[in-house]
Every structure is written in C-alpha cells, then in structure tokens.
Amino acid sequence: MVAPRLASMAQQFKTSTELVQVTDIVYLARGHAVNWVLVADDSGVLMIDAGYPGDRQEVLASLRKLGYQPGDVRAILLTHAHVDHLGSAIWFASEYGTPVYCHADEVGHAKREYLEQVAVFDVALRIWRPRWAIWGVHLISKGGLIRDGIPTAQALTNMTGAELPGRPMAVFTPGHTTGHCSYLVDGVLASGDALITGHPLLRHRGPQLLPEIFSHSQQDCLRSLSALALLETEILAPGHGDLWRGPIREATDAAAALAQ
C-alpha cells in the first residue's frame, strides 16, 4: 500500500500548469506546487507572485496563453519574499528590469538583507515522512535552495497600485512573514500564504493556514485571518491550492478553527 500512496502524493507535482479565468481580467495559474495570479486589462498585464526560480517556463507559458511576452509585464507584486513566490521574479527584474513591489515591511526580505524562512534543519527533522520527502525533492529541483534576492525591490504605494492593471488594493496580512501582504483586485483576494486551500504537505483540502513551522508568527497569522474576514469578497485565489468561492468569512473561520 505504501508505493501507491507515494505515487499519489508525487502525482501532485506532475500535472501541467493550469490557467483558470476567475473574472474578466483575473487569472489564477496553478503551478506544480504553488500558484501565481495574472491580471490583464487594457493597460497591460500584472503578475502577483512568480513561483519558484525553476517555475520560469511555466510562468512564461501562462503569459503566452494570454498573448503576452515577458517584456510585457508591467510589474510583479509579491505577497511575500519566500523563494516559492519570489523565484521567477528574480529573472524578470534582472533580464527585463520589471518593477517588483511588496509591502514596505517585506522589502528588506525581498532584497535578501535577511532571510525569514523555515530552517533547513527543521525540514530535515521531518524528511523521513513521505510527504515531506517528496516535497523536499521537488523544492530542490525547482531551485528552492537559491538565496538570491531582488536588489531593486521596492515598497508598493497607493499611488503606484492605482496605476497598475486591475488597480490592486494592498491588504496587510503579517504572520507568515513580517511583511506579508494580500491583494484585492477586481473582487478577487490574492491571499498568498495568509490563507491557502491546499498544499502537497497537507491532507486536508479547503481554507486553512500552512503548518506553523513555515510562519514567522502564528498569532499574527490568526489576527490576519480576522482582518481578511472583514473584506467584501467571495473569491479566494490562494498561494497554494484550488480557487475557492464563498463568503470570505466562511473561509477565514474554517482556517482559524483548524489552527486551534
């Protein structure tokens, strides 16, 4: 029974990237283990998060599906600067000078002035578990050990946000990292890792938090759920997992209950 279970777990990493149209201008790209969001309107295309460094070809493929080339990306917004969300943005910033924005409290992290990420030692302690072993191999294959940052990363201001495709509104959601930020665009909440609906390490599917080991402050994660619950949206585009529809308070309440 062990081999079929391992094969089932590994299958999560073998599917091709899926691009889901959420609204007229918002698309959720479902990568092998992480998501990113594309916002395309008459003013151009915006990316929210950028997958692992090794997800670059999948990111480019998702842009091509909408008729865009890498040089067409107006800007990249980071929900946070973990390598599975910042990864391909390193290349965009270096090769095309693409502006990369995040919350002011996350800029130093994006520049790699410091690293606020789960310790390799803590992962190693769990690597004997099948899910962790498979995820670890995938992480390494996608460049998850790269420590490069984005020297040009800058803080997103209200004025800048108003000029970007979809006019994204920043929603400060610290906890997973000190400067984690979600974005509300065209009625869709791009929540990054403040609120997810699935992950290769997790059996449960549905609104939830990532395991506490991955977050800077679990208490801040819970407080951020309370902040998200106040938003007027019924569409959740998470950093990991499936698109979720329904009152956002139902999602945050479910995640908070699981975290107790």
Language-model regions, residue ranges each:
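Active-site metal-binding motif and surrounding structural segment of the metallo-beta-lactamase
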Residues: 56-107
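Binuclear metal-ion centers of metallo-dependent hydrolases, dominated by the metallo-beta-lactamase
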Residues: 243-260
